[in-house]
Curated annotation (Swiss-Prot):
Keywords: Cytoplasm, Lipopolysaccharide biosynthesis, Nucleotidyltransferase, Transferase. The lineage of its organism: Bacteria, Pseudomonadati, Chlamydiota, Chlamydiia, Chlamydiales. This is 3-deoxy-manno-octulosonate cytidylyltransferase. The keyword Lipid biosynthesis does not apply. It comes from Chlamydia caviae (strain ATCC VR-813 / DSM 19441 / 03DC25 / GPIC) (Chlamydophila caviae). PANTHER family: 3-DEOXY-MANNO-OCTULOSONATE CYTIDYLYLTRANSFERASE (PTHR42866), 3-DEOXY-MANNO-OCTULOSONATE CYTIDYLYLTRANSFERASE, MITOCHONDRIAL (PTHR42866:SF2). Its EC number is 2.7.7.38.
Amino acid sequence: MKKQVFASKKVGVLPARWGSARFTGKPLASILGKSLIRRTYENINQSIALDKVIVATDDQRIMDHVLDFGGDCVLTSPECANGTERTAETISRYFPEAEIIVNIQGDEPCLQHTVVDALVRKLEEFPEIQIVTPVAKTTDSHEILTNQKVKCVFDKNGKALYFSRSPIPHILKKETPIYLHIGVYAFRRNALFNYIESSPTPLSQAEDLEQLRILEHGGSIHVCVVEAKSPSVDYPEDINKVEKYLTCHSSASF
């Protein structure tokens, strides 16, 4: 049988695995009558910058579900250690012509396609940038203090200096801005595969943040400051928070 390949040059990949330690079967969790993965897919599929949006999964149940609602999906290896590895496998096997790849976490059901479009535009406008990711300003003390939310500091040119689960920078003055990292990355093709070929690093393992591996190997990640900040789903109890958010933002296209 002929191998399926796509000619798309700008691709959004939604990695979705069944066996999450924190929330088994999370992609199929229902949120106001639609699955988490469907909500994420349908939001991102409105993108005007991407040629293709595709779910990459290691589980037939997820694939069947995505195909049932009319989405595109491919099966990947269960050996992938994280979403970036699953994204890279998808691009390597199915998208030989892809130049810009956006890795979109499947647990972001409220993420708007405009965020993805902004990242793609950044890579198109600035050829020297290899990787770009969104951040959003916060004043919420819980978000700042919890280790479930990743914070980012960056220089005056928008280049990330560090990502941490701890509050950074340390706040001596109330007006100091704090930025939350949103788990979406736009890569140039070479940058994605350079990450895959790199070895794990001490800080990335200490913080359990894969993006630190790029910084520790001397790579650069640029940030794109966005207004949109919405809840993600990490645990079963987050479903209720997301449903409340969607109910309050019912005028948005969810």
